[in-house]
């Protein structure tokens, strides 16, 4: 669906990832996993115009430790390598057995619980530092809750969200 101002979803305009690039992405993921000496299997698929790489296996807990720090770092690196100067291609998402979906649900629940605390105490509350993607999920969840507003604060990896009563 399009509107006068453009496509309803900006990713609708993006080109599908060519098969040879997808193979190269999977190979880079294999190389990273091998260098890290992790025992992980790698699958790839296109989902709703997004290139998804799934990593699974016995070393999955190492990949997801620290709120998915290694997984997030790998995803960042793979996107930098394969999308620099090629924004027409969709973002590359690295996941591990639906970790991203579970993490999003956790963040929405965190936003709901934190907003309840802010509303009850009528005092601001700062959350732990988060990645830009995680902060976006929390901001969107908080935007749907009446009586609170949110603001990102800090710099770099220490950037976090503070929730205020409206």
PLM features: residue spans?
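RNA-contacting regions in translation and RNA-metabolism proteins
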Residues: 1-166
């Amino acid at each position: 669906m399009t509107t006068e101002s453009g496509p309803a979803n900006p990713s609708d305009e993006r080109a599908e990832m060519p098969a040879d690039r997808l193979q190269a992405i999977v190979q880079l993921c294999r190389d990273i996993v091998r260098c890290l000496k992790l025992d992980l299997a790698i699958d790839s698929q296109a989902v709703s115009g997004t290139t998804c790489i799934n990593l699974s296996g016995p070393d999955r807990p190492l990949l997801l430790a620290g709120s998915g720090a290694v997984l997030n770092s790998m995803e960042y690196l793979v996107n930098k390598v394969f999308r620099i100067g090629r924004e027409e291609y969709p973002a590359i998402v690295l996941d591990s057995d639906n970790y991203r979906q579970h993490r999003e649900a956790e963040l929405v629940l965190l936003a709901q619980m934190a907003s309840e605390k802010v509303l009850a105490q009528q005092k601001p509350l700062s959350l732990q530092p988060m990645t830009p993607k995680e902060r976006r999920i929390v901001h969107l969840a908080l935007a749907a809750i009446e009586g609170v507003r949110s603001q990102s604060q800090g710099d770099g990896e220490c950037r976090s969200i503070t929730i205020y009563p409206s």
